[in-house]
Amino acid sequence: MASRVESAAWRALQAHQQEIAPLQMRQLFAEDSARFERFSLRWQGMLCDYSKHRITARTMELLLDLARSAEIEAARNAMMQGQPINLTEKRAVLHTALRKPQSVPFAVDGQNVAADVAEVLAQMEGCCNRIISGEWVGYTGKAMTDIVNIGIGGSDLGPYMVTEALRPFAHGKLNVHFVSNVDGTHLSETLKKLNPETTLFIVASKTFTTQETLSNAMSARAWFLQCAVDAAHIAKHFVAVSTNRAKVVEFGIDEANMFRFWDWVGGRYSLWSSIGLSIAMYLGFEKFRQLLAGAYAMDEHFCSAPLESNMPVIMAMLGIWYSNFFGCTSHAVIPYDQYLHRFPAYLQQLDMESNGKRVTRDGTVVDYATGAVIWGEPGTNSQHAFFQLLHQGTQIIPADFILPLKTQNPIGAHHDMLASNCFAQTEALMKGKSEEEVERELVAAGADAATIAALLPHKVFPGNRPTTTLLLDELNPFTLGSLIALYEHKVFVQGIVWNINSFDQWGVELGKQLANVILPELQASSNAAAHDSSTNALINAYRAQRYC
């Protein structure tokens, strides 16, 4: 297949970028009073304002031409139909099937996927109801008060983010904790707060062999048995989300408390599956269903809306515009809601593990940029940390601003202040402040000519910095589900345009392989000598401190 950069659509965008580069957004707004209406979308309690981008109507036409030339709609349909679009692992990509209503039949290769999903959801619901009601008791007859999810990557980031985001919707009968890092500090600090008599552990590992997860699970098991003593009690305090029945049973978990999921669910898309058990326990199962319903609603929008009014497609193509035609290498996500403080970290895995690829689907090294670096922190904290670089740095960094219109905590004028900061930042990034404006300000403040000359270059803001603003009527289980699915589909569209496989993650493997080599060397009786001089020296410095 010819490189994307050789296509007519790509070349047209390259030429257009040269034409549009000198344009200032403040000029575009001044010339078009309907610019916001022209470049914004409303959908089910969500507003996407993309008018503060370096685009014209012609830009969007050309970007959508590129999307069509990449056959976005055919690729989308292939994913939704369960075709094995994960080519390197020969797997379907069906996380969207997890959130379909049970009344919607769905089969792949003769397998009734809808029935399989319904069966696991029913198992999850039954378990959640028993835990929440207090029917499920531990080895001393006490009900559970704390849930500890032990997982890593997609088995941690998604559930952790969702439970933090939806904390106001929790039923309040259970505390939830997450342990992911193999650093013993993470587990130790968590266990200090807990009573083994009232703690339930969820061990989330598809293979039940993941090093970090199994190390933490075994240490949690040992901690539990210090009090419970009898290994038979493990079945009352540990459940598993896995497909490895033999390993689960060997650990001491009752097979009836193993919640399965499927190869067609990638880790970073797995919160909708039984990996979301901690979410369902913390919120209650009805709220978990609302989360699924919100994601399904976005799936339907993605599948049915024309490209011109398709929110995931628009956001994806704007990302392509900056990555491939402006040379931008990173993208900031700024949620103006403290409950979404883990959302940027969740998106890091979703986006960077999906689209951080250097070869096309047929194995050819790409000759264009692919995945961007995703990063961010909540506003207004971020304004006092890294917004200096966004406003006056040498890099153009597109940013998404996310704000729920309704707050869950209406304290005084706090939410008004939060919203005013959000809107002000997008305006400031777009407009900037010219030399003339700075000079007028300084003159009005009584500055003399020398002071003005000295300060002027430091106080100029170039502006023309692009942002998308997403307004949610409210952050709740439904809208959060929609928001997550919006970004999932954005990432998918970009992967198709870049002609890469967004659903494998071979880059995770090499470091794990080498760690398995180095681990016994750390514990060996002699110094390491089999690596490069740097790695040998680091291993030996560790050994000298820990073992010598």
Swiss-Prot record:
It is found in: Cytoplasm. The active site is at 353 (proton donor), 384, 512. GO terms for cellular component: cytosol. Its main location: cytoplasm. Belongs to the GPI family. This is Glucose-6-phosphate isomerase. PROSITE patterns: P_GLUCOSE_ISOMERASE_1, P_GLUCOSE_ISOMERASE_2, P_GLUCOSE_ISOMERASE_3. Its EC number is 5.3.1.9. Keywords: Cytoplasm, Gluconeogenesis, Glycolysis, Isomerase. One of its GO terms (biological process) is glycolytic process. It catalyses: alpha-D-glucose 6-phosphate = beta-D-fructose 6-phosphate. InterPro entries: G6P_Isomerase, G6P_Isomerase_C, Phosphoglucose_isomerase_CS, SIS_dom_sf, SIS_PGI_1, SIS_PGI_2. One of its GO terms (molecular function) is monosaccharide binding. Catalyzes the reversible isomerization of glucose-6-phosphate to fructose-6-phosphate.
